[in-house]
Amino acid sequence: MTMYAKNNTAGKDMLSLLEWNKEELTDIIKLAVAMKTNPAHYSHILSGKILGMIFDKPSTRTRVSFEAGILQLGGQAIVMSSKELQIGRGEPIKDTAHVMSEYIDAIMIRTFSHEKVEELAYHAEIPIINGLTDLHHPCQALADLMTIYEWKDQLEGVKLAYIGDGNNVCHSLLLAGAMVGLDIRLAMPKGYEVDETILATAENLAKESGAKIFVTVDPKHAVADADFIYTDVWTSMGQEEENAKRLADFGEKYQVNAELASVAKPDYHFLHCLPAHREEEVTAEIIDGNHSVIYQQAGNRLHAQKALLAAILEAK
């Protein structure tokens, strides 16, 4: 009867997207669109469910969207930082995972080490959601796919150019795109490439889905005829000491500006996961212009994560 019961996804983790298949991801996106269109219909489906949220990194979009999302579905959230928990004083992750599994229904964690999230998931008896690690940002990728789907009514064959650092956002975008059949072009300077293992995994996924993956150091080559142009900050949290070098290494060549965007399709859309540094990775003219859909994209974090929560928490 309900879309969220289509696949047996109850209890699944969301660590890197690789726990899910193409059909399951597509169902999440379609459910997210349905929830956005008719939120009242889903307002009680997670009644009685509790989401624990652990933050080791500052957050605006992840915290507010997850907390609002579980509330809008009838559940509740408990927000914590590692400093407030015994894990911050040396308690083993194993013990924390088992104990929290006795109290709540799922954990969303935003932290630095991806291995920490994997260890938490290994020991927990409840679903674990990666709210961001240094290696992956799967929930952002869900919102990205949703935004693309809303504009194109499809995912297969859509041309997406990512310009900038081969970081966690890029990793998840690459994996998601490879799973659903996007035409992905990556442009980044030497020394800032995506993780080799993740690229190899994406290339294998692309063989199954029909996705295309192209990597270059030439931004104009990547952006040529693109439907979407995506970028992210050149200096992420924890890399502040590298900022001067990074600004020099990326420079104007990798900035998304009017000149670069001119080779994309005339009706292209601009994406950015935020927060943004205007006049660094993107000009104000582009990010605040008519082609930009960054606020729709940010808003879709809410809807995509609501769909994810419904899928893993056995929605009523």
Swiss-Prot record:
One of its GO terms (molecular function) is ornithine carbamoyltransferase activity. One of its GO terms (cellular component) is cytoplasm. Pathway: Amino-acid degradation; L-arginine degradation via ADI pathway; carbamoyl phosphate from L-arginine: step 2/2. Its main location: cytoplasm. It is found in: Cytoplasm. It comes from the Bacteria. GO terms for biological process: arginine biosynthetic process via ornithine; arginine catabolic process to ornithine; citrulline biosynthetic process. L-ornithine binds at residues 168, 232, 236-237. PROSITE patterns: CARBAMOYLTRANSFERASE. It holds the Pfam family OTCace_N. Belongs to the aspartate/ornithine carbamoyltransferase superfamily. OTCase family. NCBIfam families: orni_carb_tr, PRK00779.1. Reversibly catalyzes the transfer of the carbamoyl group from carbamoyl phosphate (CP) to the N(epsilon) atom of ornithine (ORN) to produce L-citrulline. This is Ornithine carbamoyltransferase. It comes from Listeria monocytogenes serotype 4a (strain HCC23). The gene is arcB.
